[in-house]
Amino acid sequence: MGQLRIKDKSQRDGYKPNQSIAILRYAHISPLKARLVLREIQGKDVGDALYLLAVIPKKAARIAEKVLKSVIANAEQKGLDLDRLYIKKAVADDGPILKKWIPRAHGRATMVRKRLSHITIVLEEKPEGKEEE
């Protein structure tokens, strides 16, 4: 798996104090495959998203689950109310592409592109008045 970088961006880049963020850089999965899973959890409550990721049979779900658990721990460390958290943003950006040549028939070679992703998950507390019943 890639390296997990935790950045406290509460004072810059438009992030607010009631948000928590975790970024996994250089994840060994194609951004297209990661986006399929991340689209499913965006906007959901944290508990629902964890359950959903546990039952999705994809590699991207395992990676996203680890990042989600990390961002939940960041929110807990920040003192946010875990019951009011929802996933505000879940994106997979393009990382670098590892290129290697594979020998083929008749003296040819073709390039294989191993795509890497940067996965970002942002949690935010729901406002007091907008509690779901």
Swiss-Prot record:
Keywords: Ribonucleoprotein, Ribosomal protein, RNA-binding, rRNA-binding. InterPro entries: Ribosomal_uL22 (IPR001063), Ribosomal_uL22_bac/chlpt-type (IPR005727), Ribosomal_uL22_bac/org-type (IPR047867), Ribosomal_uL22_CS (IPR018260), Ribosomal_uL22_sf (IPR036394). PANTHER family: CHLOROPLAST 50S RIBOSOMAL PROTEIN L22-RELATED (PTHR13501), LARGE RIBOSOMAL SUBUNIT PROTEIN UL22M (PTHR13501:SF8). GO terms for biological process: translation. This protein binds specifically to 23S rRNA; its binding is stimulated by other ribosomal proteins, e.g. L4, L17, and L20. It is important during the early stages of 50S assembly. It makes multiple contacts with different domains of the 23S rRNA in the assembled 50S subunit and ribosome. The keyword ATP-binding does not apply. Pfam families: Ribosomal_L22 (PF00237). Part of the 50S ribosomal subunit. Belongs to the universal ribosomal protein uL22 family. It comes from Aquifex aeolicus (strain VF5). PROSITE patterns: RIBOSOMAL_L22. The lineage of its organism: Bacteria, Pseudomonadati, Aquificota, Aquificia, Aquificales. This is Large ribosomal subunit protein uL22.
